[in-house]
């Protein structure tokens, strides 16, 4: 299982939100490229970037920062989400060296767009499912739909989606533990690999994910915990690599 540091971009800075609220953000760095360097030097094998402004505005806003990080680390798999609503945006990011694009809101509102994107950019598309009580939320979590996360995941199986990033909104940024049960249930319900996100606080939370013994869970995204020092990226990755259960 991969430990994937998150860099959330707002107005060019690296921030963390609580439960997706833009008004409840903490700035951790004014230099996201240097922050990326810190996690790379700490041994991370993939980076998770989110354009928060883009998620709310429906188009990339912090694209230059994303491109700068991708150019600095051409051999590092990078995934980007937030404001990806057109094939042109995907092409821009892929050309910039980004490994994966995460389609969130549009995947819920127009599932056929995921099919198109997977055909145009095979192996490059991740679907981001952000859920509240099992129902998928959209538009920067401002709206909660009537669509179940497990149902939507099954819908994308035939498209060739590389992974699903599953976030439990109630847990995100709160550092109260990941929703292991819901994450494992999603991994069991779908053939698409799942990346857990939201709420990871320490090594104990990583262990709980591993103890779920779900081969479908391939990674865990962590944000506030690594910024506030309750989780060490290198230590957590080493723990995953050596885990025997």
Swiss-Prot record:
The keyword Amino-acid biosynthesis applies. The active site is at residues 8, 130. GO terms for cellular component: cytoplasm. Pathway: Amino-acid biosynthesis; L-histidine biosynthesis; L-histidine from 5-phospho-alpha-D-ribose 1-diphosphate: step 4/9. The keyword Thylakoid does not apply. It catalyses: 1-(5-phospho-beta-D-ribosyl)-5-[(5-phospho-beta-D-ribosylamino)methylideneamino]imidazole-4-carboxamide = 5-[(5-phospho-1-deoxy-D-ribulos-1-ylimino)methylamino]-1-(5-phospho-beta-D-ribosyl)imidazole-4-carboxamide. Keywords: Amino-acid biosynthesis, Cytoplasm, Histidine biosynthesis, Isomerase. SUPFAM superfamilies: Ribulose-phoshate binding barrel. Gene3D superfamilies: Aldolase class I. GO terms for molecular function: 1-(5-phosphoribosyl)-5-[(5-phosphoribosylamino)methylideneamino]imidazole-4-carboxamide isomerase activity. It is found in: Cytoplasm. Its EC number is 5.3.1.16. One of its GO terms (biological process) is L-histidine biosynthetic process. PANTHER family: 1-(5-PHOSPHORIBOSYL)-5-[(5-PHOSPHORIBOSYLAMINO)METHYLIDENEAMINO] IMIDAZOLE-4-CARBOXAMIDE ISOMERASE. Belongs to the HisA/HisF family. NCBIfam families: 1-(5-phosphoribosyl)-5-[(5-phosphoribosylamino)methylideneamino]imidazole-4-carboxamide isomerase. This is 1-(5-phosphoribosyl)-5-[(5-phosphoribosylamino)methylideneamino] imidazole-4-carboxamide isomerase. It comes from Ectopseudomonas mendocina (strain ymp) (Pseudomonas mendocina).
């Amino acid at each position: 299982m991969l430990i994937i540091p998150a860099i959330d971009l707002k107005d060019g800075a690296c921030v963390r939100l609580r439960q997706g609220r833009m008004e409840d953000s903490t700035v951790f760095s004014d230099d996201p490229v240097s922050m990326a360097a810190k996690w790379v030097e700490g041994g991370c094998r993939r980076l998770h970037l989110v354009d928060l402004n883009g998620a709310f505005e429906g188009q990339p806003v912090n694209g230059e920062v994303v491109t700068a990080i991708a150019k600095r680390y051409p051999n590092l798999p990078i995934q980007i989400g937030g404001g990806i609503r057109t094939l042109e945006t995907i092409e821009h990011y892929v050309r910039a060296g980004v490994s994966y694009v995460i389609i969130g809101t549009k995947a819920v509102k127009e599932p056929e767009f995921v099919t198109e994107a997977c055909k145009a950019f095979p192996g490059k598309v991740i679907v981001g499912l952000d859920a509240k009580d099992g129902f998928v939320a959209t538009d920067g979590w401002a709206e909660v739909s009537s669509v179940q996360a497990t149902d939507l995941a099954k819908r994308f199986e035939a498209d060739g989606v590389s992974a699903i990033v599953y976030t439990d909104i109630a847990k995100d940024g709160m550092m109260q533990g990941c929703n292991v049960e819901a994450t494992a249930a999603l991994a069991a319900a779908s053939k698409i690999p799942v990346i857990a996100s939201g709420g990871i606080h320490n090594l104990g939370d990583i262990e709980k994910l591993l103890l779920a013994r779900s081969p479908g869970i391939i990674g865990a995204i962590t944000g506030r915990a690594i910024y506030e020092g309750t989780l060490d990226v290198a230590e957590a990755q080493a723990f995953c690599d050596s885990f025997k259960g």
